[in-house]
Each structure stands twice: as structure tokens, then as C-alpha cells.
Amino acid sequence: MDPAMPLQLWNLPLLLVGSVLGLTSVSAQGNNLEICLLPLDAGPCQALIPKFYYDRDQQKCRRFNYGGCLGNANNFHSRDLCQQTCGSIEKVPPVCRSELKTYPCDKPNIRFFFNLNTMTCEPLRPGLCSRTINVFSEEATCKGLCEPRKHIPSFCSSPKDEGLCSANVTRFYFNSRNKTCETFTYTGCGGNENNFYYLDACHRACVKGWKKPKRWKIGDFLPRFWKHLS
């Protein structure tokens, strides 16, 4: 390091790298779930840049100090941007978010756990057991408690996209955070499939799917669940 060069200039490349990483996380709209479930990673450098990340355990966006280099894509310039990218991820009960810890065993019976990365219930590999609460003796129990109730087309979760042109056309889109259809101004070209001519069409495609029976409550299966842990 040149002693004559101010410390701020040495930190400048770190700030630039941090900005690039932040932009990368924002542009990856197609992989929101993968990005948002990445663990907090402030990076190895020493800058203190205020950023936001999605906390998969608390299921909300939280502030952290980014070091300025490396890290991962779960790194947003603002809370609003974090919410736009990750806020529509389906919430699941705390029991389903518990980290899976396994150990070798010779029990032949199949058990199931909720994989937060895939948002599905999956069988434990043969020869593995677990005492964590995110393990269920029956697949139906796991699915009933943990798996998101999604009965709507995937495009209903797409963000509002006004398009690329300059027209001013009133359209409707499904706001996945509020679970309602709302108006927006469409510019006439580009955009995505979350774009409806009529409010009723948006409602039929995206709103009705959310009005299904509620997910099971933990009390519905707790005695049987604890029995299999003993």
C-alpha cells in the first residue's frame, strides 16, 4: 500500500465491487427463492456499507453491514428492494423452518422433512435419522403443516412490470404481497404475464386460488408428532 494514498481511495474498489454485487442480486428476479434463502454473508472486507438481506428464519428483510467485497446475492440496497424481491415468498410455521440435523441410524422406517429451499416435503435419505422438530413420521402431516397452499398460476407471483414503451394504458396485476388485484399503467409493450385487461380476469386467475382451506395448525397433530420422537 502506498502510504501517501488516502485510506478512502484504497476502500473505493471495495465500494464499487459491493455496488456491483448489489445490482446482481436485484436483477436475478427469476431466481428469487434461491437468492432469498442464501445465508447472511457480509464478505471478508472491512467496509461498513448499510445493506439489507432476507432472513430465512425470521422471514423478513433485515439490515446488515456489508464489508464491500464478495458475499452473495442476498444483498439489497434498500429494505423496499429486498421486500420486492423476497416479500412474496410464502411464509411457513417456525417448526418447518428448523434446520435439519441428521445422524446415521439403521431404522428402516421412512420419515419426512420440510426442505425450505424447495418448499416441499422430502424423505430423509436411507440410513439417516433426526431428532429435530422439522421431521415427520407421515408425509401427509408434513405437507399439511408446511407446504405452501399454491393454487394459482406462477405468473401471479411476478412483479408489476410496466413494459418498455411510452403508452399509458390502464391494466390490472396481482399484488402477491397484498393478495389483491390492483391497477397500474402499462406502456404498451414488453412486461410479463401478470397483466390483465379486466379486474375480474385478474381476480379469477389469481385471487380465488388463495381462498382455500387454511393450512393445518400444529395442535392438530402435536400428540402424534411428539410420539414418534420418543
UniProtKB/Swiss-Prot annotation:
Residues with attached carbohydrate: N168, N178
Free-text tissue specificity from the UniProt record: Highly expressed in placenta. Also expressed in liver and kidney.
Keywords linked to the UniProt accession: Blood coagulation, Disulfide bond, Glycoprotein, Hemostasis, Protease inhibitor, Repeat, Secreted, Serine protease inhibitor, Signal
GO molecular function ontology, one term from the record: serine-type endopeptidase inhibitor activity
Disulfide-bond pairs as recorded: C36-C86, C45-C69, C61-C82, C96-C146, C105-C129, C121-C142, C156-C206, C165-C189, C181-C202
Oligomeric and partner information: Finds in a complex with ABCB1, TFPI2 and PPP2R3C; leading to the dephosphorylation of ABCB1.
Record PANTHER family: KUNITZ-TYPE PROTEASE INHIBITOR-RELATED
Protein name listed in UniProt: Tissue factor pathway inhibitor 2
Gene name per UniProt: Tfpi2
